[in-house]
């Protein structure tokens, strides 16, 4: 405590970010302040050189303060820089008492550029600087389905570079385009089609009606497979905005954020209103063993969403709850980011309060559906047995695969919300010559990506204690808090025992080794995770090997033998690099005379 007391007596009056650590140097919390001295001292009460938590703080904060043994600060120029740095560090380091919102993606917009002679609908996530661009969105899902439907229903120019070709293509022959490239339609006639396209984007009911008519025609002509494609597309477009029945008399452009939480679970709902209609919505489920802070959740949600410059900003941002201090901070952040004032408010009456109530009702409904399942009970039992500090709500599982140290690859699979999240899987080509260096490379590359993809609660490693220790060292050097377990086969005479029907799995934690019965649900849960990572890595290895065999066959056709292929691979690193190399470079490696 002497170090902490000394730090508290020498705090700067500058803007910056502060970090609290426990006695083991585990990161507890990251915060930011306009005045570090005032903010940090507000957590503590100091009497006779004895430090205690401020009794006015919440129980959650008091519990955290009791664990603080060290603090560090990072000074920045102003409060805006501190706000952005705080958000970045929380995502990268995942402190124990901070809430981590993972949904920080920029949603797509549909746009049409009317400064061109023949405008077409396209998708963007960025602001386009040319004049005459009209945006629609954001779309949390279904933007591509809308786009595909527009191109199939209307004779639009099908590709951006079509006009440059000056020659009609197959789309003209199948009556999907009017061939403006050959002047078969005037600009004025095409503009009518473009305006019809605008109407369908703005009025999804009309778009859906046209799709239903097309589906019916296909079905009547016994083209059932094509009709099914339209049926699925209609379903996706209908899901984009479940609140489209809500039309307000005033043409509001609003973004709406509602947060609802209790115990160790919470839900954040986002709704986007344009022209008085809700055009899309999204939600995120959040878990935390240490309770929730609405201010912190709202702050992170707003920064995540508006940190990238968006093509279409609302007139106003509505929140269901937030302190005046945080509201002011976020207002300044938005104004600074977009160089204009966009109001943030917590509505107390009228239409806008009704919108917040609808968002809250949906958040509560999603929350109520989060019933405790058998899987949740197994997670709790696994956390208790393996002495994990955090509930393993999000898990990353790693495995490597190779054949005689060739075609070395690694795979990472992700498990969250009681399901494998295949969109988050990652594949890696590895250079290591043995399983230890391969695993080290795999885990290091993942840790280096924590700033872009926040770390999970738990890593599961397919390997023994050596691989577990490698993971712990990498995480220690990264500064991020992630817990680790490993699973390996039982060994006899220093070899993994894999006899049919007799292979036993052992689970390793930093402090223990567990040999559980095959019927143990906790073991089966870890095995399920390991088996999926193994399947993923093996499949990637096989596809890599097949691709390499094809490349070798092509080189053999050019008169290059296997020994020469190995030399070229050792030098250039990949078949793609060999293809790009000149004959002179390849001959130099093979020491051939030209």
From Swiss-Prot:
Its main location: cytoplasm. It is found in: Cytoplasm. PROSITE patterns: GIY_YIG, UVR, UVRC. Keywords: Cytoplasm, DNA damage, DNA excision, DNA repair, Excision nuclease, SOS response. GO terms for biological process: DNA damage response; nucleotide-excision repair; SOS response. GO terms for cellular component: cytoplasm; excinuclease repair complex. Residues 13-99 form the GIY-YIG domain. The keyword Transmembrane does not apply. Residues 205-240 form the UVR domain. InterPro entries: GIY-YIG_endonuc (IPR000305), GIY-YIG_endonuc_sf (IPR035901), GIY-YIG_UvrC_Cho (IPR047296), RuvA_2-like (IPR010994), UVR_dom (IPR001943), UVR_dom_sf (IPR036876), UvrABC_protein_C (IPR050066), UvrC (IPR004791). Pfam families: GIY-YIG (PF01541), UVR (PF02151), UvrC_RNaseH (PF22920), UvrC_RNaseH_dom (PF08459). GO terms for molecular function: DNA binding; excinuclease ABC activity; identical protein binding. The UvrABC repair system catalyzes the recognition and processing of DNA lesions. UvrC both incises the 5' and 3' sides of the lesion. The N-terminal half is responsible for the 3' incision and the C-terminal half is responsible for the 5' incision. Interacts with UvrB in an incision complex. Belongs to the UvrC family. HAMAP family: UvrC. This is UvrABC system protein C. It comes from Helicobacter pylori (strain ATCC 700392 / 26695) (Campylobacter pylori).
